[in-house]
Every structure is written in C-alpha cells, then in structure tokens.
Amino acid sequence: MLTVVKKEPTPEEIKAWLSTVSGFIQGATKIDDRPTRLYDYQVEFNECRARFRAVLKSRQTGFSFAFAAEALAKAHLKPEHTAIFVSYNLEDAKEKIRYARMLYDTMPLAWQKKLVTDNKTELEFK
C-alpha cells in the first residue's frame, strides 16, 4: 500500500522558490483569478542562465507570454534590471508589454514595485 503525505513547505523553501523567475511568476501572479501556471518548457527557458538564448519557434506557442512574464519577474527580483523586447513589428512588442502589465495588475499590492512609467511601449518600475 502506498501512502502520500503532503508536506507543507517551510518558509525558507517558499522564499527560495519565490526568488526564482518561474517561482515568482507562478506564486505572485494570476490568470483568470487562478495562480499562473507555466508549462515545463517555459520554466526551463526562464531558468536558463545562459548569456544568450535562441529559440526557433512557431506562432502561438506561449513564448511571448513567457518573455513578458520573465521580464516582469526580473524587474521585481533584480535591482536595475532592464528588458527590451525586439519583435517582428511594433504591435508584437506592444503585445508583450500588455502581457507584463496584465500580470503586474494581478500581483499582491505589497509585492508590486511602484510603476513610474506606464504606456503602450514601456513599463518602468522603482
């Protein structure tokens, strides 16, 4: 007989998880009033520490969302972090800003950095 026992994470484990990009996204943001859940490939991509990352992708695979979520998380986890979205066209870049703003709006107020610039092409936090 197999018994599954749920163990509550310790405060240290929660802090360590939230200090990662994927943990922050999944622990601090929501989609449709439910915690954000990333696919395994999104977690793997976000946690990659390589200086340069290249992706050969098709459309509608969730990478635009992952890029926006990663930029938002790093802006909150790292001081003086800057993310630049280079896209096929301006509308595609604006879409990533919209995703980041949507996730920012779902974060607990106590965790939100102050939003000092908010327009269609830029978000700046202090």
Which positions does each model-derived feature cover?
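Phosphate/NTP-binding elements of NTP-utilizing enzymes
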Residues: 2-126
